[in-house]
Amino acid sequence: MILCISQDNSPTEVVMSIVTISHAPYSGGSEIAEKIASVLNYRCVDREVLIEASRRYGIPEAKYAEILEAEGHWWERWMESLRLYRITLQAAMCEVAQEGPLIYYGRAGQELFPGISHVLKVLIVAPMEYRMQEVKSQKGLDGENAKHFLRELDRVRSRRMRALFNTEWQDPVGYDLVINSSRIATDSAAHLISQTVQREEFRPTAESEKTFQDLRTTARVQAALITSPKTRNIILNVRSDGGQVHISGILADPDLEKEIVRIAKDVVGVTDVMTDIEPPPIEYMHP
């Protein structure tokens, strides 16, 4: 996002288009992302989002990397242990995106901007044989060793994305554009993506800008609540509409509602807070 000066000399925020590049390991996705950034003069970011999340919320960058890339524990699928990382990662992504147009080729980009029409979501794929050649070139592995290495990377990433977002990251339905890098060269892929993101369908509109602002405020409030010692274990629904924040959920301790409102009101971009908090069912409190 950038600041422009309107005719009445007041600053106005202008949202620019965003491209997310999800890619199979060793499919050339990083090179394509960097080429697009060069063509469009966009920022190209990856771990910068993890650094921003770590700086804002005091969570080590290495922990985010572990959550996104390493083999998960069996209990994470049923417990809410990943909620902290999912929420703070999205909040950090929104903060990075507000600084201007960007290409994001890190993990989970396709899931971090739900409902934003000026985000072009791209998936880069390639056949196993092509990726095996890349592994041989970069790591010296070949044959079954290369294939096992890639299958393990794919398995771990798929498991992590299911645990974090309950989604299959390789499902093409979740993307606007799918490119086979074994058939389309880096320069051609970058040209195709660059042309697509400049089309009418992906240009920011007043509606998409508002949707982004609402997402950013929602993410900020969610992150503030989940990083506060008093409210971190409470699951709440948060929604922002033009700065008016609506918070709903079930709360066993009614005194915490004031704390929830206080935390939300302290968030930048929040103009008002409305709550719809209910007590737990009687059978829950007295089994």
Predicted regions and their residues:
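ATP-dependent small-molecule kinase phosphotransfer cores
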Residues: 50-104, 141
